[in-house]
Amino acid sequence: MNFETQVNSSASRNSVARNNYEQKSRATSLSLPAHMSCSYQESELATDTQERSQLRYITANTDTEEQSFPVLQALNTHTEELNLDVLLQRADHLRMNEFSKMESFELLWDHKEKFRDEIEFIWRFARAYGDMYEISTNTQEKKHYANIGKTLGEKAITRAPMNGHCHLWYAVLCGYVSEFEGLQNKINYGHQFKEHLDKAIELLPEEPFLYYLKGRYCYAVSRLTWIEKKMAATLFGKIPSSTTQEALQNFLKVEDLCPGFSKINYMFLAKCSMDLKQTEDAVKFCDLAMLLPSVTREDKDAEDEVKKISSTLKR
């Protein structure tokens, strides 16, 4: 059973409409990444990737870790001291650009000793480890980033149980950690994911990203095998249940709150509509998906899936 949330760049990065939404909702303190300009050149991306790949790894031990994990060493040896508000604003701003997430992580890393007890810093640092999980292509590194981020997330929700951002990113990181676990632990993390996602929605009811995640959860649960449902019932006393219709409603909620949220949200809208035999809607969502630029690998994967759906619908 795959409970991974797939909180990748294509899920939380959006179109021009998403940029407008973020400007309106900046006061929520949750800065989700936005689409880059379509004029960003492939050569620039390649150069940036090559430079990043040359970074040295160091080993760090923090009070949130029980073992050593590799983390990226900052590119700049000189660290500019920032106050908390300026630091958070700068980290959020960097993260809005898909190709500056690593720089945002480095900035937070450089200030972790100074602000390690500040809640607004902690949940962002946990989120940044989730970003590094997405950026890394090495399985062991991804596992390390997921585990550190989850530990930071636990610290955040313990200290600020009424902060929706803490619950959001803890849920996300539970999804990432679950990718390296067996079936029983996957089910356990899926349960935690749902629990904290629901709490985040209660605290942040207007945040579209949460409904995207809820849609993904519902879609995955609707496709559980009998043995997976049986094991979940054994662990938690009840069988998890959801439907494609419920998944569709959550993806539609995303579109209602922020039209053009992401290519992958349109892809799932098309998937759900096709499964429910709502052919006209499926075609519409495929067309809308193709109008959005494909910036990241996940965008390209979503576009490939949309093309397959379109081909199926034309038969």
Task: Identify the function of each model-found stretch.
Residues 140, 278-280, 297:
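Structural helix-adjacent loops and short alpha-helical linkers that scaffold large soluble proteins
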Residues 258-278, 282-286, 292:
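C-terminal transmembrane module of eukaryotic multi-pass membrane proteins
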Residues 118-124, 137:
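Short N-terminal amphipathic alpha-helices
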Residues 82-90, 124, 128-131, 169, ...:
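"A position-specific structural signal for the A-helix of alpha-solenoid helical repeats
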Residues 119-120, 164-165, 208-209, 244, ...:
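Boundary/linker segments of alpha-helical solenoid repeat arrays
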Residues 89-90, 94-103, 127-162, 168-206, ...:
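Short coil/linker segments at helix-helix boundaries
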